[in-house]
Amino acid sequence: VAELRMGTKFHFTGFLKGDDVDHMYAISDVYVMPSVSEPFGIAPLEAVRHNTPVIISKQSGVAEVLNNAIKIDFWDVDAMADAIFGLLHYHSIARMFTELGADELKKLKWEHVAAKLVTVYEKTLAQRA
């Protein structure tokens, strides 16, 4: 970023908390989490909650849960660049991901997860009886 003199286009924030987190998502056009190993990152879900389109690596744990995000291979920097470019230049695609992501996030509430878990336990117990 520094070599290309693009520092004004990116935010490398380090640790943020509280209102600073909300502000950063509010001013961001795209959230990118290119982690090679992230058991489960909550940050992409926070980005979706703030209507920011998300790009995550296929290798991340959140990729198993979040369907309405662009998923790229961590090592494929060309695909990552293409995804960023696409979201920045094709607003209808970015809007589609934010709208579908918001709908998806509503289904990821703890109440729904708990209900699914209860169903799994009930089915397991019924099979053992």
Feature-to-residue mapping (PLM):
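Nucleotide-activated donor-binding/catalytic signature segment of Leloir-type glycosyltransferases, i.e.
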Residues: 1-16
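Conserved acidic donor-binding segment of nucleotide-sugar-dependent glycosyltransferases
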Residues: 69-78, 86-91
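Short glycine/serine-rich donor-binding loops of glycosyltransferases
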Residues: 41-44
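A charged, aromatic-enriched C-terminal amphipathic alpha-helix characteristic of glycosyltransferases
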Residues: 92-122
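Short alpha-helical donor nucleotide-sugar binding micro-motif in glycosyltransferases
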Residues: 15-16, 23-28
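Aromatic "clamp/platform" in nucleotide-sugar-dependent glycosyltransferases that forms part
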Residues: 36
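Short hydrophobic beta-strand element within catalytic cores of glycosyltransferases
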Residues: 53-56
